[in-house]
Amino acid sequence: MDKTLKLYNSITRTIDIFTPRKGNEVKMYICGPTVYDSSHIGHARTYVMFDVIRRVLSDYLKYNVRFVMNITDIDDKIIARANETGASMEEVTRKYTEEFFEDMKTLNVRSPSFVTFVTSYVDKIVKFIEKLEANGLAYESRGSVYFDLNSYQQRYSYPLFKSKDGINSEGDENKDKRSPCDFVLWKRSKENEPRYESKWGHGRPGWHIECSVMSSDILGEDLDIHAGGVDLAFPHHENEIAQCQAYFMQEPWVKCFLHTGHLNISGLKMSKSLKNFTTIKEALKTISPRQLRVLFLHHQWNKDMNYEKEHLKFAETIEKKIFNFMSVAESMRKNALAFETLENADREVLRELGNVQEAVHAALLDNVDTPAVMKRIVEMINFTNARIKTISPSTVLVVKDYIKEITDVLGLSEEERQESPGEDLIAQLLSNFRESIREMARRKEPYSKFLEKCDWIRESIKDYGYIIEDNSEGSILRKK
């Protein structure tokens, strides 16, 4: 099978052929959250879509992926939140770290191979900065340490994801810098801020240095893939590249940089600073985790995406189509025979399946084109459904098993439990139905009464979003 994967590389601004540096091993790093608040659906999109890319690499293309994520648990925003709430920094970061991973589990995002916390890496961060200083690429000023961009540019290529003005102040005091574009590696501590010892005095790590140190500690001096949201491209990712190339004295540090596009609401980027964000938990009150993933899959991962109400309904419709088909197909398994005569309709469906398999494979290799994959999957379901009464159960199951293979790669779990407020009522309804049937059997009531009761349960369960369908193979339960 051709494994020539092409990915949009933010460094080259082109779709490049991806080949790991070392055999079958892929070293992949993603910037995790700064844990001072609840994650929003913009974050959800980033982590879900990189979960999909990771699954394509590991499950579909069979690469051995080492996937590292950091947690930023020292930051100005965390300090501000602790001061606002009266909680300690540890209480703030613990709360939102736990909430983040709960959200990721709900969204069926696989756990990283390794998770790193900044607070556990301060000593290594200090040593990393000391080497940059020794290499002549960092300098101390009034207890803080800055990256010397002018010195760096004389040796290495920079910038890569340049902003409009190229200035990276990040709120630092320019009077302490040699150049306004220099960025902080070590911040001197102010009163009532967390502080760690260093040869420059008490301070704490700057934002960018954290990821450089943690990624290289786990994955070594170079990466195959670095991933994150496009809002981190400048200055964060650009500065990461500069730090690592200066430290290891080689380039390129990252082979392929991947950035998800912005998630927009009413044409505006969703962000906490604009106060137009919807948390993941709030979003999941109106759409299931699987439906949210379906919605994301219908948009190319590296393009901007609009989040609109009508899109939620579309995702719900597509999700039900896929998993209702899987449910109906699975109900046929008991009647599928290993040796069946193929009719023309069976051959037609299997021929179309072959075309779809080729198209899906090509789409996955072409920058992980999930919209094209979803389109072909739905078309295959429609094609099969139109002939389902004239083809054998075995043919239906061949289609179903392939669709399950691909939906598994996309992270659409067939076993996802769809919780709803009516679940307890459904359980009570079925309990009452069972008790009624037992009582009717004890009274030896006529056969027609049992059929009436079966019709009653079929009508009653519709109120909770389920349909019981009878066919020649028996009865199946599916969602409306």
From Swiss-Prot:
Positions occupied by motif 'HIGH' region: 33-43
Position of the signal peptide: none
Record keywords, A-Z: Aminoacyl-tRNA synthetase, ATP-binding, Ligase, Metal-binding, Nucleotide-binding, Protein biosynthesis, Zinc
UniProt: ATP binding residues: 272
Intervals of motif 'KMSKS' region: 269-273
Record keyword Nucleotide-binding present: yes
Family: Belongs to the class-I aminoacyl-tRNA synthetase family.
Entry protein name: Cysteine--tRNA ligase
Source organism of this protein record: Encephalitozoon cuniculi (strain GB-M1)
